[in-house]
Swiss-Prot record:
Protein name per its UniProtKB record: Alpha-(1,3)-fucosyltransferase C
Gene3D superfamilies: Glycosyl transferase family 10, C-terminal domain
Subcellular location as annotated: Golgi apparatus, Golgi stack membrane
Segments on the Cytoplasmic face: 1-37
Native source species: Drosophila melanogaster (Fruit fly)
Source taxon at top rank: Eukaryota
Gene coding for it: FucTC
Lineage of producing organism: Eukaryota, Metazoa, Ecdysozoa, Arthropoda, Hexapoda
Amino acid sequence: MYLGRVHCSFEVPGLLSGRVGHMSMAVRSVRLACGPRGALLLLLLVLLGVLVVLHKVTQSPLLNQNKILQDHLRGQHERYIQSTRTILLWTEFFGDSRWKLSWDTLGPQELRDELHCPVYQCEISNQNAFLPAVELYDAIVFHAAEMFPLLRPVPSQRSPHQVYVFALMEPPGETKHRLDDEQGFYNLTMTYRIDSDVFWPYGQLLDITADAVVAPSVKPPWRKPPVAFNDSLVWDLWSGKTKTAAWFVSHCETLSKREVLANRLQEFFEVDIYGNCGTLSCTRGDPHCAEMLDTDYFFYLAFENSLCDDYVTEKLFDALERTVIPVVFGGADYSRILPPHSYVDANRFMSVEGLAQYMKLVVADPDLYVSYFWWRSHYRLTYSSPFCDLCARLHDPSFGHKTQFYHDIQSWWFNSCRLQSRIRL
């Protein structure tokens, strides 16, 4: 049936007038001759046009700057996390080319399963040829207690993105480099100092309840010692102990003068000295030596060879594994390392006599002696590889945008030590 010509018109709203994208909307009214299907088609086209315009507006950089930035940073972060970082061990670690690691080259699986690194997408190798060129490594680690290798003192090429790491677990007196010749050479430090870029302690304390490592750190959230504490095992061991103090030592003349302190203590009670500096011997690694501390001795002398910030050695942490109170002597602030009332700090006393008298007091008072072991109910000793920290650092997106340099590594390292102890020797 013929319906005749049907006129239809579409009024374009005035608010769309002007230019949106590349489309001119200046025409306010369009009158077309069309049939019913044409009218429907026209309506669909108009709706499609509106959707296109709205899409262009909502995706405009003028309105979506934050989203564009967020997408970019998120993608960059994912790339940093997923990609593998490579670490080259340039020098040996006291003659050990593997740095006490299990293989010449460790991959992500070993970092995850053996070192238990939370961030493990790294490869560590002592083989220069692991990558085609030395400048391709993300980080190169130099042990400052070793001389540079004679045939290859330093890498011949260095890329801008590459990180050179100053690594040392010993105090500054053990440095075998002329650091005044290495200004601006290192980007990161990996040492026992808490303010190092990569922390390398001899041991750590984990809060059992929080399941988190709390020390060493600048201000550990230590729990308060209880007013009263009882441990039947410690009581039983206390009753069988007969000797005041033991000391295992191999270096007899030191910068800290610890040997003087030990000799002065012998004016007040007997100190059994094992090793090169005494008359007694006990083979390193012999379990009897450790058990002897539990059964025979009230104290163990954890005296350091240098008075340097944060410097404490494995002998302190070894003593914490035994039922013996460590008497500490060093340059560290021990409140940043050990729980309160878990040790006796020689530098808290003005004189050797004052220290000796307090040690005698503790020996004679079983309640006081047992109270020094309260921390075992709340903390346990643990250890993590510094390579876990280094791997995480190399994966940090913020670190990828900047490369710092130590322009005076010598002052940073050497100024952390002193020659004079607080206790008068």
